[in-house]
Amino acid sequence: MTAKKTWSDRFEGSLHPTIVEFNASIGFDIELIEYDLTGSIAHAKMLAYTGIISPEEADSLVSGLEQIRQEYRTGNFNPGIDQEDVHFAVERRLTEIVGDVGKKLHTARSRNDQVGTDIRLYLRQQIDDIRQEIRNFQQALVNHAENHLETLIPGYTHLQRAQPISLAHHLLAYFQMAERDHQRLGQIRARTNISPLGCGALAGTTFPIDRHYSANLLDFEQVYNNSLDGVSDRDFAIEFMTAASLIMVHLSRLSEEMILWASQEFSFITLTDSCATGSSIMPQKKNPDVPELVRGKTGRVFGHLQALLTLMKGLPLAYNKDLQEDKEALFDGVKTVRICLQAMTVLLATGIQFKTDRLANAVAEDFSNATDVADYLASKGIPFREAYNLVGKVVKSSLAAGKLLKDLTLTEWQELHPAFEADIYDAIAPRQVVAARNSYGGTGFEEVRSALIQAKAILDHRKFWV
């Protein structure tokens, strides 16, 4: 039997069954139930504080709401599609538990400010959780960086070998990306942490409510100072999905590198059995499913951002049913970012091993030290552009002769330019090439060591909302 709608007394007929199903959001907004109960408890206490209901009535409402919370947690509260949404489902069950006093809970409140409150409480908690997961991801990066401060790896531009760098320097670049993500979410949290409770349907209420009282109970920092804006604002959700998209961009870039590094063509890392899968037909395969899935799920989060932007672009003030569509995009975006952060953290912690011998060979078998030859000449007083052009010719002739720069004899160097001396070999040795780049933020070992100390200091600061 279909439950009577809370608003149905205005109507003579009943909803068509197809429209009941089409209209219902209980299938996904049940995700908000814990936050709905928390918001309702604060609202009930505010109603008593302002004398709108008696303290005894508030106690009864709070007790009933806590009972529903316990029923939900133990699997004994499972509202069906006929309940329409989580708000009506809770109110109906509350009235069953406490009687007619349950009908007073919605005094001075609309579903519009109620759902806005729920979503903000939900997202605030999710932001806190995601920020901690970013910290876990950063810790995994730091752990590898500590172990590989002096491990060399080819640095690339245009996916062509450019200059050798410290592997730790490479990993700490992702630490910095994640740090921006962490800070960005902190800023968004502040704009999420504003209470719309008490805005009513759109115009406020005639009851003598105290919006700051309920906001304080819910740990909101502020209240909306315009009721129309309070019930219709979803900027915070769009901002979150923008930040989530950037998190996924960073995870996807790292994933792409992991996929390349695990290939036989690069062979920079080995995937452990804990984070790789096999082929159904090719027994030799070990597939990098984790980074491939992260790369694939990135587009999913981008899609949710586009969905929210498109949803909001044409909505007149204040609330419109379209806003029901914000939740599935937001919920799935949150879940996707969280599982991707968790999976990449596990991959870094237990799923990869760097092949240091292969990396050492990789930085010694190319011309990525050519810039250092030009720098060498420039340090001898030769204009850099002249030195640059000369080294280009050296590389060209060396390639034709099948030689690397390290293979040239001192005589051959001096035939190219008399400024070359025996110390050219030290200058172009991969370890020296890296060590010499000690400008601030560079890949020189001392600079990377300082960056590592700074990264560890950030992680040691456990007040992660700062």
Curated annotation (Swiss-Prot):
It is found in: Cytoplasm. It comes from the Bacteria. The keyword Oxidoreductase does not apply. CDD domains: Argininosuccinate_lyase. Keywords: Amino-acid biosynthesis, Arginine biosynthesis, Cytoplasm, Lyase. Pfam families: ASL_C2, Lyase_1. GO terms for biological process: arginine biosynthetic process via ornithine; L-arginine biosynthetic process. InterPro entries: Arg_succ_lyase_C, Argininosuccinate_lyase, Fumarase/histidase_N, Fumarate_lyase_CS, Fumarate_lyase_fam, Fumarate_lyase_N, L-Aspartase-like. PROSITE patterns: FUMARATE_LYASES (PS00163). It catalyses: 2-(N(omega)-L-arginino)succinate = fumarate + L-arginine. One of its GO terms (molecular function) is argininosuccinate lyase activity. Gene3D superfamilies: Fumarase/aspartase (C-terminal domain) (1.10.40.30), Fumarase/aspartase (Central domain) (1.20.200.10), Fumarase/aspartase (N-terminal domain) (1.10.275.10). Its EC number is 4.3.2.1. One of its GO terms (cellular component) is cytosol. Pathway: Amino-acid biosynthesis; L-arginine biosynthesis; L-arginine from L-ornithine and carbamoyl phosphate: step 3/3. The keyword Zinc does not apply. It is an enzyme of class 4 (lyase). Belongs to the lyase 1 family. Argininosuccinate lyase subfamily. HAMAP family: Arg_succ_lyase (MF_00006). This is Argininosuccinate lyase.
